[in-house]
């Protein structure tokens, strides 16, 4: 009997190990090679599959090399920010094949194909290649199918234009505080002063999202921002070791810190939400901040169709990740580009003076700023907050002339498309806001060639929030200062989650 039990145990162990080996081989070798053969037969050009790591190690090494030194302010930023996708474009054409680990990734630049990918949200779903990124927050941008539709429906009221108009006074309050700080710095030096505007802009946009999202709980909100910023840095460090199997599970100092910071964020958010729910139960009027509107909208859902506390916590994290990061990088690149193009800075200031004079900017006036809108669109074209979007296919799909098997990813290289001479003309790399004088449709020739906030049904729900906040900030800055690049300015666009200035943005501010 003892021998029989040992034999059975051994046999089971062999079966389990064999199954594990087979699954691993299938994931690492057989499935990728099968997908590669299918794509090659259709004439798709690209790199050959390297077991497990694909092109990932090369991508990282090229990125590290490209970002090891700054560039001139007039240089094309693409070789620094997206060296590997740019090389693939030059070598293998506008539709090409790369490998993110064992996952084949097809880059497309054709506007009609991009439009199809954006429109078919149930077929081309969000890619979840890097599990550790979930620690920063999931929420609306990472959901698919019915859950995405449910969350979009609940969150929509918080970003309705009428609700955003009610937040303009918060935009003004936070932006005025920053301008006041800069004014004091300049006054202490006389009439001009060198200022790294990047830290101030990140702090200001964090203050805006803290106040608009959490109202009276904005101080706790500031702590969330600090932790989210730290987490983003730690995730990027871990991302560079992604090709090492199991690295994210090792008890490294960075990995341990990530888990601790993530837990602290969860605890703060749970406390804020629970406090709001207790206040509502005791009969207090709902707050008009984003969280208050979200809670009220969620309350109006039928049984089983609302969000859990955990769901709301993820959406609150997303308020920070998407709302704060997007606006701060839009503002910093706007100031950098207007420092280089004094004629457009003067035109923007003249428009602000015509609309507001020296008075406080209001919603109605902000919506009249045509030159400012043109400038912001051009900044978003040349320096999109997110330089690349990905989608995943889970079943066989047709896309143009290609038949794509399930298991393939689609890459939408925002930065490459935005600077593509075939779509935007030979001056695609130049700062020319006049492209947008007749609106987006005319500028893009009704093609999907401009998508800094994505496009279609999944277009960023907070884009109006971002643009209105940016207009408020730039109006106040232009009323008080002129600015130019400082001699110590170092041009080094760098991407972790969003495209930001690696060494800050040192400008000379001149008091008007």
UniProtKB/Swiss-Prot annotation:
Heme binds at residue 460. Belongs to the cytochrome P450 family. This is Cytochrome P450 72A14. Disulfide bonds: none annotated. Its cofactor is heme. It is a single-pass membrane protein. GO terms for molecular function: heme binding; iron ion binding; monooxygenase activity; oxidoreductase activity, acting on paired donors, with incorporation or reduction of molecular oxygen. GO terms for cellular component: membrane. Its EC number is 1.14.-.-. The chain crosses the membrane at residues 2-22. It holds the Pfam family p450. SUPFAM superfamilies: Cytochrome P450 (SSF48264). It comes from Arabidopsis thaliana (Mouse-ear cress). The keyword Ion transport does not apply. InterPro entries: Cyt_P450, Cyt_P450_E_grp-I, Cyt_P450_sf, Cytochrome_P450_Monooxygen. It is found in: Membrane.
